[in-house]
Structure formats: structure tokens, C-alpha cells
Amino acid sequence: MKIHLATDHAGLALKDKIKLHLTELGHEDIDHGAHEYDALDDYPDFIFPCAKAVAQDDQSRGIILGGSGQGEAMAANRIKGIRAAVYYNGPEEIIELSRQHNNANILSIGARFMSEKEIYRIIEIWFDTDFEAGRHQRRINKLDNY
């Protein structure tokens, strides 16, 4: 699967490690930046191109990172067709439900609140969980048609 990645400075080191993990899992990564550390960078500059790419290819997904992942998810969710779910720790069921009920196509991770090992585990759960459709598809259609 194609996985689009983006982060600001807060997730830069983790993004590069996630890329290696994705390769080990057999996925292709497309890196939308940041490519170098700049404490003054602005996350929308990287998140918008990533989210647009995911929106244009429904067979791909995205992983975005930031300090908390909140602003990044807000930016991604501005793009029609994107359903970004935020995770920065807590019950793993949150990740499962983001796929089962919400068909999340972007995972927004709070890099300052999770270890590398925790992030790998969450990514694998997210990849392994399918959308249930049914009554949930009706709700997704309403989001997409708004």
C-alpha cells in the first residue's frame, strides 16, 4: 500500500524511523516533508500536500505527525475526502474504531506523547483493521457530500 507521510519539526525524527518500519512491513512511502529540522516551520505546508495525495488515491493512506497531532489533523480534515483520526495514546480500541466505524484514511500521531515502539504498534493495528461499512458508510457519505 502507498503511505503518504508528513510532519513538521516536532515529528521529524520519528517520521524517518516510521519510513523504515513501513518498508519492513512491505509498504511504499511517499514523503511530503519536512525534510530538515526547522523549529519555525508550519505544519500546513507539509500536511496539505499529503492529505491531497491521499484524497486523490483511495487505495492509499496517510500518516502525519506533530507535537500532539491535533493541528495536523485539523489541517488534513480541511481536504475533501479526508478522515484524519488523532491518536497520542490511550486505549488501542480508539485506533480500531477509527478504521471500523470512521474509515480513517489518515492517522495523525502526537509524536511528543508516544514512544517509537508504541507508534509502530498503533500503525500495525491501524493497517490491520478494516472498515465495517454498513450503517457507517451512510455517515461517511454524509461527510463526503457536505
Which role fits each region the language model picked out?
Residues K2-I3, Q59-G62, G81-R83:
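Short active-site oxyanion
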Residues L65, Q70-S108:
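Mid-chain, well-packed structural core segment of small domains
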Residues F46-I64:
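Short, structured active-site "lid" loops
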Residues L5-L25:
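Glycine-rich phosphate/diphosphate-binding loop of Rossmann-like nucleotide-binding domains
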Residues E28-L40:
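A short beta-strand-loop structural module common to alpha/beta enzyme folds
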Residues A6, I30-G33, G62-G66:
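Short, conserved beta-strand edge motifs with alternating hydrophobic and charged residues
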